[in-house]
């Protein structure tokens, strides 16, 4: 009986989603004289996270600049909440460098979560 319960527990743990990899990083706010326009996705972008979960960045979704990290410019969604998922669900902002999504800033944890492969994105500026 004990062995059976142990086996069930191990199988349950093996079925759990992996944790999202993060590293603490300070978000540098944009200065008043920094002109970073909001962006709008011109096409949808499907993302496959390292955790196995997928997310879609919807066509025409608007993202406003929230600050900078060494990894790129941080954008938060306008009028909605965007999340990424692993073992837990995390609110996430996009980190974009050279027209590529390189990872996510997790505001609740004040951490950066990189993508293993950057995703090319097509955006337009909003005035």
Regions found by a protein language model. Give the residues of each.
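Short, low-complexity, disordered segments immediately C-terminal to signal peptides
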Residues: 22-29
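Mature extracytoplasmic domains of secretory-pathway proteins
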Residues: 33-97
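C-terminal motif of bacterial Sec signal peptides marking the signal peptidase cleavage site
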Residues: 12-15
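C-terminal partner/receptor-binding element of secreted or periplasmic proteins
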Residues: 98-127
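Bacterial signal peptide processing site
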Residues: 17-20
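Sec-dependent signal peptide recognition
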Residues: 2-8
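Intrinsically disordered regions, especially transient/low-confidence alpha-helical propensity segments
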Residues: 1-2, 60
